[in-house]
Amino acid sequence: MNITATVLLAFGMSMDAFAASVGKGATLHKPKFSEALRTGLIFGAVETLTPLIGWGMGMLASRFVLEWNHWIAFVLLIFLGGRMIIEGFRGADDEDEEPRRRHGFWLLVTTAIATSLDAMAVGVGLAFLQVNIIATALAIGCATLIMSTLGMMVGRFIGSIIGKKAEILGGLVLIGIGVQILWTHFHG
């Protein structure tokens, strides 16, 4: 996977965390930068670990399905991207129903895990490709750190508008990467 695809994947994977951070930022009254950075660090750390876990799981199975690798990555990315788009169009966001209060550490960790399950599934798919998983996981984590911190800071202004559009955009990016993987396989 080339650098462009890695960066697109990283920011595509960060969109769930961005959307959750926008929602969290929207529920707080003037979130401080330190709160936004803490959220970004937690989300980024979890989002770095989950593709590594998924990659490890995928490596265990890779010798059994190596000839299907491009199809597995394609189907996973299409599925995850489609799910993100559907969630983006649904409109109901549990984060919007929380009262305006500061968010505790464990609530942030739980939210980070929930938004990073897609990254674990992508990690499974990446096990079947020629990819530097450490660099990819770090790129995903860094993108998530940036996007989650930014999401918290702008959340109070645009939470109800961009939150769902971010999921739609992230889903489209994942689908685009899936199509690119399949295209590269068939067209060299």
Swiss-Prot record:
Keywords from the named record: Cell inner membrane, Cell membrane, Ion transport, Manganese, Membrane, Transmembrane, Transmembrane helix, Transport
Main location: membrane
Compartment list: Cell inner membrane
One GO CC term, this protein: plasma membrane
GO MF annotations, alphabetized: manganese ion transmembrane transporter activity
Transmembrane regions listed in the UniProt entry: 3-23, 66-86, 106-128, 143-163, 168-188
Signal sequence range: none
Keyword Cell membrane carried by entry: yes
Membrane topology type: Multi-pass membrane protein
Protein origin, superkingdom: Bacteria
UniProt keyword RNA-binding present: no
Family affiliation: Belongs to the MntP (TC 9.B.29) family.
Job description of the protein: Probably functions as a manganese efflux pump.
PANTHER family: MANGANESE EFFLUX PUMP MNTP-RELATED
Protein name (Swiss-Prot/TrEMBL): Probable manganese efflux pump MntP
